[in-house]
Regions:
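Post-Walker A alpha-helix
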Residues: 17-18, 263
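Hydrophobic anchor at the beta1->P-loop junction of P-loop NTPases
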Residues: 6, 248-252
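Short beta-strand-centered segment that lines the nucleotide-binding/catalytic pocket of NTP-utilizing
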Residues: 7, 25-40, 274-285
Length: 296
């Protein structure tokens, strides 16, 4: 059985993710107390469920101590367990709570316990509680994602087979800031920029004309080779840490041309060595065709 645990910061997008998983054919349970995870998962497997997703919202360190114990037991039973952790910047979380006028769960809990927590304090406390989870989870920063983009990325995550180590190559634009969840960051702003070619400016690194332009530049090929060599050298050491996910971010100025192309090429390079996911932070959902590089 495939089991996906959806968790993360309050306001990070867990509800959207769990709805997308349900639409993808998963048997979904929202807001499950961690102590019920093991018996429910065992029962689902016994009843022949092939794919299930459970959303867990931790409000104390003890919650995930129970969850980790359950996950170890499930893995020993041969159940394919993966954790999807959704996060966002403090500013974006504040905006989302203000927009929906909902109270943060930890603020409500603190009130019942006779204490007061501001929204900023509740968010900071939640980050502290959830920090250990990020070491074994696939972390997705939803700060600049539209709901449609988040649903698309969840679809991609589901399609990706489980592997001992999954590499995520993520392009981004420096003018919008670095992604929150990044293990390695490579700056490709020194490469020739298609933006200054009028016919290429409105296109992206997924378009064949831009890809052709960059493929003909020796510096681009050299940069890709150097990044690939670095990753290949250190990949065994990351595997040795029993990590499940490694996020490699590639940045250019706007996240539209160079970083997109380089991320795509690196994803192809490592497709045979690990599970790979390629995503492009700066591109809106309507600029993400299934495969614009098919002509290469």
């Amino acid at each position: 059985m495939q089991l996906i645990i959806v968790t993360g910061l309050s306001g990070g997008g867990k509800s959207i993710a769990i709805r997308q998983l349900e639409d993808s054919g998963f048997y979904c349970i929202d807001n499950l107390p961690a102590e019920f995870l093991l018996p429910i998962a065992e029962n689902l497997e016994k009843n022949g469920t092939r794919a299930a997703a459970v959303a867990i919202d931790a409000r104390s360190h003890a919650t995930f101590e129970n969850a980790f114990t359950a996950l170890e037991a499930l893995s020993q039973r041969g159940i394919d367990v993966r954790i999807l952790f959704l996060t966002a910047s403090n500013e974006e979380l504040l905006r989302r709570f203000s927009e929906t006028r909902r109270r943060h769960p930890l603020s409500t809990l603190a009130e019942h316990q006779g204490r007061e927590l501001t929204l900023n304090e509740a968010i900071a406390r939640k980050r502290e509680i959830m920090a250990p989870v990020t070491e074994t989870a696939h972390v997705l920063d939803t700060t600049r994602l539209l709901p449609s983009q988040l649903r698309r990325w969840v679809q991609q995550f589901v399609k990706q087979p489980a592997a001992k180590l999954t590499l995520t190559f993520e392009s981004f634009g420096y003018k919008r800031g670095l992604p929150y969840a990044s293990d390695l960051v490579f700056d490709v702003r020194c490469l020739p920029n298609p933006y200054y070619s009028p016919e290429l400016r409105p296109l992206t690194g997924l378009d064949a004309p831009v890809a052709s332009y960059l493929a003909q530049e020796p510096l681009v090929s050299e940069m890709i080779d150097d990044i690939a060599a670095f990753i290949a050298k250190w990949l065994p050491h990351y595997r040795g840490q029993n990590r499940h996910y490694l996020t490699i971010c590639i940045g250019c100025t706007g996240g539209q041309h160079r970083s997109v192309y380089v991320a795509e090429m690196l994803g192809r390079r490592f497709a045979d060595q690990a599970g790979t996911i390629v995503r492009h932070r700066a591109l809106s959902a309507n600029l993400l065709p299934e495969n614009k590089l098919q002509t290469l």
